């Protein structure tokens, strides 16, 4: 096992200007998969500035912080988001093949 970081992105799906969800959750998941590639996506509810919205928690392994920041910039533009939260977790991980 090697020590690496896992990143979890929290992507709200409500447009920052209209406060309405423009893209369906299933379509949003497909877009995230196109941008990020290998990841685990979990549907959840989140709150931003007191506003409840559908949120995707996106878990990413075996990537660098720079790659993750690049994904966030792309996703911010696509989903018209003010920000995307990034959680960085140090852990031991390996792929068993």
Where are these regions (language model features)?
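Positively charged, small/polar-rich N-terminal and surface patches that mediate targeting and assembly
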Residues: 1-97
């Amino acid at each position: 096992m090697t020590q690496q970081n896992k990143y979890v992105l929290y992507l709200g799906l409500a447009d920052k200007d209209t406060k309405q969800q423009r893209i369906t959750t299933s379509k949003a998941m497909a877009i995230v998969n196109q941008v990020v590639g290998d990841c685990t996506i979990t549907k959840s509810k989140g709150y931003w500035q007191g506003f409840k919205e559908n949120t995707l928690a996106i878990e990413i392994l075996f990537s660098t912080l720079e790659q993750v920041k690049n994904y966030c910039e792309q996703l911010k533009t696509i989903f018209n988001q003010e920000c995307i939260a990034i959680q960085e977790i140090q852990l031991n991980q390996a792929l068993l093949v």
